[in-house]
Amino acid sequence: MIIERLVGNLRDLNPLDFSVDHVDLEWFETRKKIARFKTRQGKDIAIRLKDAPKLGLSQGDILFKEEKEIIAVNILDSEVIHIQAKSVAEVAKICYEIGNRHAALYYGESQFEFKTPFEKPTLALLEKLGVQNRVLSSKLDSKERLTVSMPHSEPNFKVSLASDFKVVVK
């Protein structure tokens, strides 16, 4: 089965009305536009998304829906660093340091809380900066992702220089 478009999200439906099969993905697999996976029930699916979400697949995204059968995305829990900032200045420092490492950064549960995938050097940096943190198991859902850039990706727009030296995006 080849999936080319997302059909919706489970949060917009009553899952009890359907037979739901899941594709379990690690957080870093949610940004793939082309991939092959097996569902929990053993169905082979190929994903070739034409209009992939910029942030990637999210928890509950529906890949396939036919009558009462649904195949949806389940993002597996992974080891993450939960970061709790104390001030706006500390938020800026956290965003700068995590971004400087090109690491993924996600919104947390509260206003000054963030999550990033666990890496020992990042944990050591946060400790050195005196930033409150703890290592927990949690989902890193693309809809909560702060960073949008995708390494090694091609832009889906064309930039050219106009005769009056203005940048034109098409």
Curated annotation (Swiss-Prot):
<dbReference type="InterPro" id="IPR012406">
    <property type="entry name" value="UreE"/>
</dbReference>
<comment type="function">
    <text>Involved in urease metallocenter assembly. Binds nickel. Probably functions as a nickel donor during metallocenter assembly.</text>
</comment>
<dbReference type="Pfam" id="PF05194">
    <property type="entry name" value="UreE_C"/>
</dbReference>
<dbReference type="GO" id="GO:0051082">
    <property type="term" value="F:unfolded protein binding"/>
</dbReference>
<dbReference type="InterPro" id="IPR007864">
    <property type="entry name" value="UreE_C_dom"/>
</dbReference>
<dbReference type="InterPro" id="IPR036118">
    <property type="entry name" value="UreE_N_sf"/>
</dbReference>
<dbReference type="GO" id="GO:0006457">
    <property type="term" value="P:protein folding"/>
</dbReference>
<keyword id="KW-0996">Nickel insertion</keyword>
<dbReference type="InterPro" id="IPR004029">
    <property type="entry name" value="UreE_N"/>
</dbReference>
<protein>
    <recommendedName>
        <fullName>Urease accessory protein UreE</fullName>
    </recommendedName>
</protein>
<keyword id="KW-0963">Cytoplasm</keyword>
<comment type="similarity">
    <text>Belongs to the UreE family.</text>
</comment>
<dbReference type="Pfam" id="PF02814">
    <property type="entry name" value="UreE_N"/>
</dbReference>
<keyword id="KW-0843">Virulence</keyword>
<dbReference type="GO" id="GO:0065003">
    <property type="term" value="P:protein-containing complex assembly"/>
</dbReference>
<dbReference type="GO" id="GO:0019627">
    <property type="term" value="P:urea metabolic process"/>
</dbReference>
<dbReference type="GO" id="GO:0016151">
    <property type="term" value="F:nickel cation binding"/>
</dbReference>
<keyword id="KW-0143">Chaperone</keyword>
<dbReference type="GO" id="GO:0005737">
    <property type="term" value="C:cytoplasm"/>
</dbReference>
<keyword id="KW-0533">Nickel</keyword>
